[in-house]
Regions:
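Oxyanion-binding "anion nests"
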Residues: 1-31
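CBM-like carbohydrate-recognition segments
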Residues: 38-125
Length: 125
């Protein structure tokens, strides 16, 4: 079963890399980013984490995915306020909402920290 799930992970990673916005974020609607054009940091954090983890574990080629990870990480760091608050986090709900820079949730911060832990490991290589 391991190889089966690894193949799914690689396919999902490739698709997600192609859906990254020009601004570095993944938006609330992956297939129609214009419907929710504002940044979305919780998804971006989780995706950056997943891709960086794959690079660190040797599952994903760094030459292909490192530029995507760096662009996503740069986007995430732009969303951190001077007081440390992470903004642009989609609220819990049944469907996407328009978000603003001052909107945050704990899981957004968690996603940021998970991404940071893998970025740190990348920087150590």
């Amino acid at each position: 079963t391991g190889p089966f799930y690894l193949e799914i992970y690689k396919e999902m990673s490739e698709r997600l890399a192609g859906l990254q916005g020009k601004d570095g974020y993944w938006h609330a609607s992956l297939l129609d980013p214009d419907s929710y054009p504002s940044p979305e940091t919780s998804a971006t954090g989780f995706i950056v984490y997943g891709l960086a983890y794959g690079i660190n574990q040797g599952y994903l080629p760094a030459d292909k995915y490192l530029p995507v990870v760096k662009k996503g990480w740069e986007a995430l760091t732009r969303a951190v306020e001077t007081n440390g608050k992470l903004g642009w986090v989609q609220p819990v709900g049944a469907d996407p909402k328009k978000v603003t820079r001052d909107m945050t949730e704990l899981y957004g911060t968690g996603a940021f920290l998970m991404a940071a832990s893998e970025i740190y490991k990348l920087a150590d290589k």
